[in-house]
């Protein structure tokens, strides 16, 4: 019976917090640029959310893949979160998803296929909500459960949002509150479910992306495993700018600050802060910085520009010193 399964006990990490640390990953892929192709609008250069390839005038294909180990004990909800997270990369580029395929790793001897079925059902329900079909997939046996999707989308090249197109002097908008990594860590340790976190992680970034494109935003990324600080740093670095954050304006999920005070801090969040700390100019406390670096799963969009209905959390600036982010 799937309701008695504690999925998080089958994995060392969970959600986007199980990513390879950013600094290590950058070392691994350094110099692996690939063949130059004028039709590749976004490729390997700046670690953007997805690839974008022009296939004809006025049309580009977006390609991305995302999968991870469970951050929730409920298999259906894990499937929903994983699918929303994978599709987020398409939305973060300003695109519209058109199809997705499942990516599965499964410890058959430890977990029944009835559990996997619930995971896949969750993913399919989110795909249906997004207006697309799940058209196939690939599976392997694995020591830990893994699930996600490879997603394909489309975008008009002149509407493409990318992480290297930010300019100074613009508002910074965040479309979801942060803190789900901390709450997921508490869930793994105690079994306590934060419905606010589940609701946030299973909310598609579709409407936020549409609003951003309509507002003329051209620089964006989504906030996932490297935390708000990490993804903002990557965007600033790729664009050659800096940013100032207003900590008091950053929205947080209900219960996240309390869970942080109780010590439920994911290792990935601490690694994120260690990675970005040399690029910070800050007077914030360590606890506040950990929250800003918290590894998000299926987080919101970080948009350079003001978008009606979503909070502004800072602004971009010229880069004049060593720091990329002032907070």
Regions found by a protein language model. Name each.
Residues 1-92, 167-172, 318:
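N-terminal glycine-rich phosphate/pyrophosphate-binding loops that anchor nucleotide-derived ligands
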Residues 2-13, 24-27, 34, 108-133, ...:
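Glycine-/charge-enriched secondary-structure boundary and capping motifs
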Residues 75-101, 118-129, 204-215, 221, ...:
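Small-aliphatic-rich amphipathic alpha-helix that forms the alpha element of a beta-alpha
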Residues 150-159, 192-213, 284:
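Active-site glycine-rich loop that binds ribose-phosphate moieties when present
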